[in-house]
C-alpha cells in the first residue's frame, strides 16, 4: 500500500507536504478512495511550524482566545497559537490550546478545569482532515453546550469548503486531490464492484486488512 503513496506540496510553500495513497478505505461513517497521510505534519515540528504559519495568515484579523485541537493536531495548534500571538489583532495574546475528551457515547466534552477556556471565548477549530464534516458537527455541538463562539475552522486537508455556513480554511483542498471521493458504505461503488477494503482509517492513521 505504501508504495502507491504520492507526495503533494502545499501551494506557496513546498515545505508543507502530505502523502496520498489511492485505494479503498473505510472510516467510521464513510468509504473513501484516498488515504490522506498527515503524519509528518502532526509529528514533525519543522513542518508543523510551517503549517501553523500558513494557517495563521488567514486569521490575523480574527480575535481568537482558544484553539480546539482535533485529531492529533496539538503540535500544530501550539505553533498556531504562537504565530497568532506574534502579529495582527492577537499580537501579545496568550492563546489557549485545548483538546476535548470523548465520553462513552462519543460526545466531545471538557472537564471543569478547562471549561473556562471555552465559555464565552472566541474559538478556532483545528482539525487534521475533513471528508464529510461529521467530526466538525460534533465539535460544534460541544461548543454550543459550553457557550463557545466559533470564529473559524482550520484544517490541513478538507474535501468540503464550509460547514453550516462557516468557511473551512485548508492548506490542501479538493483542488489538490480532484479525484477524492467519499461515499456512504451502502452506496460505495468500490464495494459494489467487489474491490476489497485496503485499510480501516481513523484520526490516528490506518490499519491494513
Q: What role is predicted for each listed range?
A:
Residues 57, 82, 86, 141, ...:
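Short, well-ordered alpha-helices that flank and scaffold nucleotide-derived cofactor binding pockets
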Residues 65, 121, 151:
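Conserved acidic residues
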Residues 130-139, 143:
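A phosphate-binding catalytic loop at a beta-strand-loop-alpha-helix junction
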Residues 69, 125-126:
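Hydrophobic Val/Ile/Leu positions in short beta-strands of Rossmann-like dinucleotide-binding domains
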Residues 62-72:
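Short glycine-rich phosphate-binding loop at a beta-alpha junction
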Residues 1-63, 203-209:
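Active-site-facing substrate-recognition patch
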Residues 2-10, 140-209:
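PRPP-dependent phosphoribosyltransferase catalytic core
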Residues 74-124, 131-134:
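Short, glycine/charge-rich flexible loops or terminal/linker lids adjacent to PRPP-binding catalytic cores
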Amino acid at each position: 500500500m505504501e508504495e502507491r503513496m504520492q507526495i503533494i506540496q502545499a501551494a506557496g510553500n513546498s515545505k508543507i507536504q502530505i502523502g496520498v495513497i489511492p485505494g479503498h478505505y473505510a472510516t467510521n461513517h464513510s468509504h473513501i478512495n484516498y488515504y490522506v497521510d498527515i503524519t509528518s505534519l502532526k509529528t514533525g515540528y519543522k513542518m508543523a511550524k510551517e503549517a501553523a504559519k500558513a494557517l495563521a495568515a488567514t486569521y490575523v484579523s480574527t480575535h481568537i482566545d482558544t484553539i480546539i485541537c482535533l485529531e492529533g493536531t496539538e503540535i500544530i495548534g501550539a505553533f498556531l497559537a504562537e504565530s497568532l500571538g506574534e502579529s495582527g489583532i492577537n499580537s501579545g495574546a496568550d492563546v489557549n490550546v485545548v483538546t476535548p475528551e470523548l465520553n462513552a457515547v462519543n460526545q466531545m466534552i471538557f472537564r471543569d478545569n478547562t471549561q473556562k477556556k471555552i465559555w464565552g471565548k472566541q474559538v478556532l477549530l483545528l482539525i487534521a482532515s475533513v471528508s464529510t464534516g461529521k467530526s466538525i458537527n460534533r465539535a460544534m455541538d460541544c461548543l454550543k453546550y459550553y457557550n463557545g463562539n466559533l470564529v473559524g475552522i482550520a484544517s490541513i486537508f478538507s474535501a468540503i469548503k464550509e460547514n453550516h455556513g462557516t468557511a473551512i480554511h485548508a492548506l490542501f483542498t479538493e483542488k489538490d486531490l480532484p479525484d477524492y471521493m467519499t461515499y456512504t458504505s451502502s452506496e460505495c461503488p468500490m464495494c459494489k464492484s467487489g474491490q476489497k477494503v485496503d485499510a480501516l482509517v481513523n484520526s490516528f492513521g490506518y490499519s491494513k486488512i
